[in-house]
């Protein structure tokens, strides 16, 4: 029979279908199995309203047949089949979809058909140098054979087939230096591809598999009898068909969920929480999500890939769909299955459509609620989770200029100096005395050191708690939030600000105490100016402190950038010039202050310089800052001891 041209006759278009749309050759089998499933769906749907079909759901199957000698792989189904006209229309026209037409014709029915764009069939040519299709439409007496070797066209002629359905025979290419095509004829290679992509197709995918068994023992058994083995073939169903995520939660045990998670996501530990979510309405999907009990080794590196496995009607479309999860929930693993997603023609990349956004938003809300439930009902487990992934939630609250802070703030935990345990911000606020003006915090490298800061001790002496922040992101997180909800004395909604104990006015002094400090600063202006000059630009100001009790000196920051934030930012490339405006605060009631005054009054400028450098270095050490010149500091200490 004469060869026909493809209706979309451009060879360039066929090359694009074969070489550009699909990035992974093994997905050809996923596409052909999905097409077979669609064909069965159509006949099964017809059987529900037409008893003459004479078949029920258990009669349908997809059969894979491999022949290494002839290098063919055949995918057969007993679905609706195709007429000659349908073969020309569906296979002779690139990017025409019979499944899409079927969905349009039955748009008022609840039918789940996978195929939409009609190019999946052409992925066959990635692995086959010739493709033969034999099909017989249901209700027809004729079968037809369609055959093509690629872009040059196809041939169509009568054929023989007993029952309705379709056989797709792939003549597999020989191996090359770069491609192992033999894998598509290998028993284990085929099984692996089916399990990966098509494990949840709802009809059995079957293949003859070679097995071994012991031959029957002779009777009577001779004394020198040795067991003998024989090989045989057996038709085996390769796919599990019923996805665990489509089952009701009451039908699945915790152990089954845990085993599924460990097997699917290659984890050795049970998940910390299982989240089952299914929605019908604006977004139709089934989701099975897991909160891991420990973080992957690469979680906080650029190599980590977030994302959920995305299925369309049980067929794997994407192993890690990043668009389904916000970054702050990137630790969540799981599966989403939807029949409503708009897929592009390769099924490998999703369009940025509204349906995906709806699912993303629904999952975000569900995950947040589940974490809240864990926090409220299983605090020990939540705190274990927090040790692994808490930093990610804090990054989420800080990122995008605090856009997600309100969503995440009640999931955050911080160490309480007073309670000596992790607390939420709400728990801190609930225990605040009525007169307390701020949520106090101190930021540094260890809770022990922070608790001993002069300003932290002062706050705690007042009976107020201090949150001790030890991770780089902590202070940035609180500063971007700025306030937290708090009801006032009359029960009206209000807010309370966060306050670094080493920055600005702590709100602990009376007006009289503030006035006295200001007067003392004015009275000692000459001394403080001399000390500021001696420190040569290292501090913005020297003044009398209202936050010191037993210590002689401390550093505070004037402005939005704290000393701890300076330390964090200085570690970043290109941030070497970022400096906080430091204030050297002195305790006028400490004996050291009298020594300073004596040096000033004696006109001993050199000694005052040394004292200023010593006190500044001491304040740096208290803050956990490196001393600017350790050698000079050591020499100054020694000279004072002589």
Positions of predicted regions on the chain:
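GHKL (Bergerat-fold) ATPase N-terminal catalytic module, capturing the glycine-rich phosphate-binding loop
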Residues: 1-184, 192, 215
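GHKL/Bergerat-fold ATPase module in large chromosome/replication-associated machines
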Residues: 113, 131-153, 173-183, 188-642
